[in-house]
Amino acid sequence: MDRVKGKVAIVTGGANGIGEGTAKLLAKEGASVCIVDIDDENGKRVVKEIKAAKGEAMFEHADVSIEEEVKKAFAAFYQKYGKMHILVNNAGVGLGGGPAHKAKAEMFDKVFAVNVKGAWLCTKYAVPYILKTGPGSVVNVCSIYGIVASDVAFYDASKGALRAMTKSDAIVYARDKIRFNSIHPGNIETPLFRKLAQMVDKQGVGHAVHMLSVTNPLDRMGTPEDIAYGILYLASDESSYVNGTELVIDGGYISMPFAIYETNTVDWTTLNFYEKPT
């Protein structure tokens, strides 16, 4: 119960899904958790649930792609706790893009603004605080599609960029005792996944879950908690010699040839879903 006791951890996109699971686990293991999200209602709910379980947490609204909002939120966290050790860059968007000759520039810009620029901005404003109280750990939540390809080019490219940025930062900040690692989830059943499944699978969410389960070596989809435990390891001192690496948590999915199931023809040029699930 004390794997990150006494540490202060920021979790972006912490109001739902992987971020929520991570925030709750870090709090359970002794960290004071700072949640950043654009979803105020669920962000405050997660804080309330953490406190009800005798944990410590606070929430600040911020769009990670907007520098002033990130700066303000991180200053508020440091003002309250007076220290900072862990940053989990989890906030992200899933926007398709479609074939290059049909894709729209504004969609490309949105994906990279949140998935890449957002992680950079959070790192920019967390590092000075971590340097004061370190050592520290930054965990960037990427995707298996930052390693292998799908047909969602903008998303894949953004996660590949975040993976590369992680490695660069791992080198830059190693002597400052701040470790950087990336975590690469496979198919995880989250509110965001369910929203996408409703859009692309004519037979519904249940069918999508079933097909992604039977095409996985472990015969199931992942849960937010599966990823949260990986993040906990990378955030804790247990991984003090782990730096600049990728942790894939996908049930073995990318270790075998892909099994693709038929849904319908997806027009990725119009498909658009943001951080806040319905």
Label every PLM stretch briefly.
Residues 2-34:
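Canonical Rossmann dinucleotide-binding motif of NAD(H)/NADP(H)-dependent dehydrogenases/reductases
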Residues 97, 243-278:
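Short C-terminal tail/terminal secondary-structure segment
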Residues 98-100, 104-109, 212:
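Substrate-binding pocket helix/loop in short-chain dehydrogenase/reductase
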Residues 120, 218-249, 254:
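C-terminal substrate-recognition "lid" of short-chain dehydrogenase/reductases
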Residues 123, 158, 166:
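Active-site helix of classical SDR
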Residues 143:
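Residue(s) in the substrate-gating loop at a strand-loop-helix junction
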Residues 174, 179, 242-244:
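Short, small/polar-rich loop/turn modules that mediate ligand/substrate recognition or access, typified
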